[in-house]
Regions:
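Contiguous, non-catalytic segments that form substrate-binding/exosite surfaces or channel walls
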Residues: 1-118, 318
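Long, well-ordered alpha-helical segments
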Residues: 1-4, 30-41, 138-148, 167-184
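C-terminal, non-catalytic "cap/extension" segments appended to globular domains
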Residues: 2-13, 41-50, 133, 141, ...
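Glycine- and acidic
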Residues: 5-19, 50-61, 81-84, 114-127, ...
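Short amphipathic alpha-helical coiled-coil/interface segments
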Residues: 19-30, 69, 195, 230-241, ...
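Conserved helix-loop functional segments at active or binding sites
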Residues: 74-85, 111, 139, 143-151, ...
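Active-site recognition of the HExxH zinc-binding catalytic motif
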Residues: 124-146, 166, 171, 211, ...
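Post-HExxH zinc-binding segment in Zn-dependent metallohydrolases
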Residues: 157-185, 194-196, 200, 274, ...
Length: 344
């Protein structure tokens, strides 16, 4: 396990450096997205808070949980009978605490147990919470498959691979929904949702990872970290990542203080690596061969029997190379172009 953790430490440093080396491609893609936001929101200048305004308004149509279940299940049909039957059983056998309730915590979580996985979510009859269902069932099925095929000590997969299975299922649902309707407004809404995932999961989490790297190195060098120092580092990183096109208001410099993951050292970069791996694997599942599907299913069944990097390599993606992140940036770039052409 120490060997596994050392591999992840190396990968952490490699990924943060890789992002910096790719700053030009990376920032160009983000600049392009910010220009798109400015144009479609009709803004002369754009602040950090404007980035959260969707380019396409949320649909009025309410999605029932039954519809969400049906579509989420249909989107994973390509993963084969065993996966689909277990997934359907989970949807219909009370694995999920579905709706908001008084005193219930917000958000969504999955917990893998020997009896079967449990999912907590707050379904709100929206497309966003349909994607949440797909995401959490991705975690649940990863737990189910690992528990079924591995001994108790080998069934607990590492956080590094956890976000891959969940995000992969979101990508499969995205593909399924986009094929169901050619309505330009619906297509634009889905692409907007997808682009925001890239911004918040790939770009933003990499910025968080770099912030962590800087402050931990300062601590290792016996430098004192005051709130002013932390604010300055965080503000500089926002300027570095978002460029001159976005007005970085003073208030954003304190955002680091409200990110709970900073209290779980070196967690956030795994969202970015997991997202990149999931994009690569979902493309293989959708456009590859039966062998690609079998490799992915073997990965889901493997628990923690190999290091996370080896498991992902077995699934069909090499996270020790820059290619998955490069390909993810390329996909983001193509989504921006597609969105513009739809909205013309």
């Amino acid at each position: 396990n120490n060997e596994h953790d050392n591999t992840l430490t190396d990968l952490y440093y490699d990924d943060v450096e890789m992002i910096k080396y790719q700053k030009e491609r990376y920032v160009n893609a983000l600049d392009k997205y910010i220009d798109l936001k400015k144009k479609f929101l009709g803004l002369d200048e754009i602040h950090m808070y404007d980035l959260y305004v969707p380019l396409v308004k949320e649909f009025d149509k309410k999605i029932t949980f039954e519809t969400a279940k049906k579509e989420a299940l249909a989107s994973v049909a390509l993963l084969g009978q065993e996966y689909v039957e277990a997934y359907e059983k989970g949807l219909n056998s009370r694995w999920i605490d579905v709706y908001e309730n008084e005193g219930k915590r917000s958000g969504a979580y999955s917990s893998g147990q020997r009896v079967h996985p449990f999912v907590l979510m707050n379904f709100a009859n929206s497309l966003d919470t349909e994607f949440t269902l797909a995401h959490e069932m991705g975690h649940a099925m990863h737990s189910y498959m690992s528990t079924k095929y591995q001994a108790p000590l080998d069934r607990h997969y590492k956080i590094f691979v956890a976000e891959v299975a969940s995000t992969c299922n979101e990508a499969l649902l995205m593909d399924y929904l986009r094929k169901q309707s050619l309505d330009p407004k619906f297509q634009a809404y889905l692409i907007n949702h997808f682009m925001e995932q890239f911004r918040t999961t790939l770009f933003r989490q990499c910025m968080f990872a770099e912030f962590e790297k800087i402050i931990n190195e300062k601590t290792a060098n016996n430098e004192v970290l005051t709130s002013d120092t932390l604010n300055q580092i965080y503000a500089d990183l926002n300027k570095f990542y978002y460029g001159e096109d976005v007005i970085v208001d003073d208030e954003i410099s304190m955002e680091w203080a409200r990110i709970p993951h900073f209290y779980m050292n070196f967690y956030v970069y795994q969202y970015a690596t997991g997202f990149s791996a999931a994009m690569a694997l979902s493309q293989k599942l959708l456009h590859g061969t039966q062998a690609d599907i079998e490799a992915y299913l073997s990965f889901l069944k493997s628990g923690c029997t190999k290091s996370p990097v080896e498991l992902l390599r077995m699934a069909g993606v090499d996270m020790a190379s820059p290619k998955p992140i490069e390909d993810a940036i390329e996909l983001f770039d193509s989504l921006i172009d597609e969105f513009e052409s739809i909205m013309k």
